[in-house]
């Protein structure tokens, strides 16, 4: 068979196919959001239905808030999400999964933050694939969106908003305390302060670790043009 006249051509086609597949795998990109569904329900009814579906799938409601009159943001967590978040030093940011319900042109759109995007951006270990699959099964998965081209896992791991700003592993340290409990108390006192436009939306404590993530809502107070 080695001398068959078709063998060189078949070998070349096979090699080209392998190189093409390798290139595709290397260039897999991820978008930050997933459009789950478009529905005929009103905002309040669709929000309630979305929370109910998430709870039936094993998620727990951690908090929610309306950033706009026509939108609700739902934050859920679960033992599995918290276990994934606890694998790494700064994984706590991934303990809350955000889902949005937005009313637009007589329809309501349900979207969620892409767990795979979060996995690479927050440098987590494995596990967010199953969260992605569970959310897609529970809420739907029509398309991914959010950026023009998406980002590869490698680029997400090095991402920072602009030159001179911190990367994920170089955060700003705001204060230090004698204990984790003292730090938590100080944060909650600050978020309880009236008149500054900040509200605590949720708090998630990672089991077995001194790591807590707070979700904060911010409202413009009109005190400065810099707010916008």
Segments predicted by a language model, with ranges:
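Preference for solvent-exposed, low-hydrophobicity sequence contexts
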Residues: 220-227
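Short, Lys/Arg-enriched N-terminal segments with co-localized hydrophobic residues
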Residues: 1-6
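Mid-chain, structured segments of secreted extracytoplasmic proteins
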Residues: 72-114
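Bacterial N-terminal signal peptides
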Residues: 12-21
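Terminal, regulation- and interaction-focused segments at domain boundaries
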Residues: 27-68, 143-219
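Primarily extracytoplasmic ectodomains and periplasmic/lumenal surface modules that are beta-strand-rich
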Residues: 60-61, 117-119
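C-terminal partner/receptor-binding element of secreted or periplasmic proteins
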Residues: 118-154
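Sec/Tat signal peptide C-region and signal peptidase I cleavage site
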Residues: 22-26
């Amino acid at each position: 068979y080695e001398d068959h006249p078709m063998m060189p051509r078949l070998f070349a086609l096979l090699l080209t196919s392998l190189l093409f597949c390798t290139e595709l795998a290397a260039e897999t990109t991820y978008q930050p959001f997933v459009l789950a569904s478009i529905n005929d329900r009103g905002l309040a009814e669709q929000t309630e239905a979305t929370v109910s579906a998430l709870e039936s799938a094993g998620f727990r409601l951690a908090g929610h808030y309306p950033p706009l009159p026509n939108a609700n943001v739902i934050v859920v967590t679960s033992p599995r999400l918290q276990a994934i978040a606890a694998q790494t030093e700064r994984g706590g940011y991934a303990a809350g999964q955000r889902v949005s319900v937005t009313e637009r042109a007589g329809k309501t759109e349900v979207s969620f933050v892409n767990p795979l995007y979060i996995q690479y951006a927050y440098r987590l270990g494995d596990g967010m694939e199953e969260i992605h699959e569970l959310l897609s099964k529970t809420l739907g998965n029509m398309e991914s969106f959010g950026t023009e081209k998406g980002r590869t896992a490698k680029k997400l791991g090095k991402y920072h908003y602009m030159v001179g700003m911190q990367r994920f592993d170089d955060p700003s340290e705001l204060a230090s305390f004698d204990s984790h409990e003292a730090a938590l108390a100080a944060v909650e006192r600050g978020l309880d302060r009236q008149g500054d436009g900040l509200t605590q939306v949720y708090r998630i404590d990672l089991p077995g670790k001194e790591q807590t993530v707070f979700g904060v809502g911010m409202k413009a107070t009109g005190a400065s043009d810099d707010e916008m």
